[in-house]
Amino acid sequence: METPNQDSGRTPTEQSAANDLSVADRQVNILRDKLRHIDRQLAAATQNNTKLVSMLETAKAEILRLKNALDQEGQPPYSFGTILQLNPRRQPAPGNSGQAATEESADIFNAGRKMRVGLSPLVNINQLTVGQEVLLNEALLIVAGLGYERAGELATLKEMLGADRALVVGRADEERVVRLSGALLAQKLRVGDALSIDSRTGYALEKVPRSEVENLVLEEVPDITYEDIGGLGPQIEQIRDAVELPFLHPDLYREHGLKAPKGILLYGPPGCGKTLIAKAVANSLAARAAERSGNVDLKSYFLNIKGPELLDKYVGETERHIRLIFARAREKASDGSPVVVFFDEMDSLFRTRGTGISSDVETTIVPQLLSEIDGVERLDNVIVIGASNREDMIDPAILRPGRLDVKVKIHRPDAEAAADIFNKYITPDLPFHESDLAEHNGDVQATVDAMVQRTVEAMYSTDKSNEFLEVTYANGDTEMLYFKDFNSGAVVQNVVDRAKKYAIKDLLTSQQRGLRIEHLLRAVVDEFREHEDMPNTTNPDDWARISGKKGERITYIRTIVQGKAGQEPGKSIETTPTTGQYL
């Protein structure tokens, strides 16, 4: 038999080479397996190394944080200071030498001491201002600029002393001179402003708005003209002669030795146009001032004083408010702008001294106003206008010539004046009902005239349906008063407003569009019906003074309308004045 080697035909050398190759393949496979194992170990080591690096970085950050915390705990605190003066780099003055006299520095107030300190190179001196707070390091070097102190004592500006100082009045009327901080140097300050001051450094830090003062003085440019006021032609003419003539022709007044009036008193029943006239005066003065100066942008100012709100429980506060009002007026008038100071309900503030029942505040308020009015003498652009429906209660010293020179009584409107007022509210641009227009062939103006005429006739009729009150005088005479005796411009406006509401309701319910004469007549009836309970019979004489029925003393009032309704027709009132009562 043949052997396998013999069968394969291989020589021993070939057989040995084949065996070596087989061994080499096995070794390669073993090495490959080892390489894979080493790669896995390397990947695991790399992952572990990444985790270790992250942990080391976290530990390093924590160590740094703890180190910074320890450093901060051991760091000395910063102190605060207030800048009094900034000293930029400058040339040495004769006799002065050293770094403090030439290098950048700042005078500050720190811990009750005034010091001159240096600035950190990181701090720009141009970004610092006087009165500002700064941070100081342990070496008392300015390292940062802060804001302004937000708390301080309150003081009132009395007078400016140059561009950077002011005279202020603090507690207990204590006066002191303060310097203005950088924040205030850029603002326009006026007398009466409230300032927050730092009493330690002597700086005024900021302007404090005081709503209780601002609400008392309402500055506005009125847009009401004399043409907007109806039924007061004679009174308007009297006021224009008193106010505008001296303003338009000052040379003629000087030639004749006349002075312009300082004030006007408008008195009469409520709702008859006293406030409207005051606003129209301010508007007219502005127009005349613009014509004279050629400055179309010249404004007028109407200081509407809310009289009763001036009263204050603290002694001297009301007088301070009055001084503030006239200081504001002088400020506005200093540039040539006309200023009207309007005191509404003047009797509530300036009543006759000695007539107060429970207080005597008028004994100091009235003299304060008198001194301010006399002080207006040197100003050509300020005029005081007072309005009241109880002029008999105003102190006579205010009403004398030289103070409120012109006294104008605003009467209740008669039929002609009422028609003029109606024409201000019933205008051709309103929608009118087709039936009313058809009665006048579609002529809108004729329709308006007819509506006004019929409405006025209904209001001023003296038949029994318009009887309102029967008054009995002290001498025994009686008089019947009608609704027309209590008419006013405000009532006329209310009648027209009611009629317009009725027209709107008809449009929404029955699709009948437009104002009708029936709406106006119905509004008149409803307006009068609302006045049935209005007469105050607790003191008929006082009520008559306010309503405008002055003359013989009234002792008894009988309400006719209530009598018709089946209620109590009236009652006699005991009108003997009590102690201290002023009638």
Swiss-Prot record:
Residues involved in ATP binding: 271-276
Keywords, in A-Z order: ATP-binding, Chaperone, Coiled coil, Nucleotide-binding, Proteasome
UniProt region (Docks into pockets in the proteasome alpha-ring), positions on chain: 582-583
GO terms classed as biological process: modification-dependent protein catabolic process; proteasomal protein catabolic process
Keyword Nucleotide-binding among UniProt keywords: yes
Gene3D superfamilies: 1.10.8.60, 1.20.5.170, Nucleic acid-binding proteins, P-loop containing nucleotide triphosphate hydrolases
Amino acid composition bias (Polar residues), ranges on this chain: 1-19
InterPro entries: AAA+_ATPase (IPR003593), AAA_ATPase_domain (IPR050168), ATPase_AAA_core (IPR003959), ATPase_AAA_CS (IPR003960), NA-bd_OB-fold (IPR012340), P-loop_NTPase (IPR027417), Prot_ATP_ID_OB_2nd (IPR032501), Prot_ATP_ID_OB_N (IPR041626)
Pfam family, one: Prot_ATP_ID_OB_N
Entries under NCBIfam families matching the protein: pup_AAA
Record text about domains: Consists of three main regions, an N-terminal coiled-coil domain that binds to protein Pup and functions as a docking station, an interdomain involved in ARC hexamerization, and a C-terminal ATPase domain of the AAA type.
Name of the protein in question: Proteasome-associated ATPase
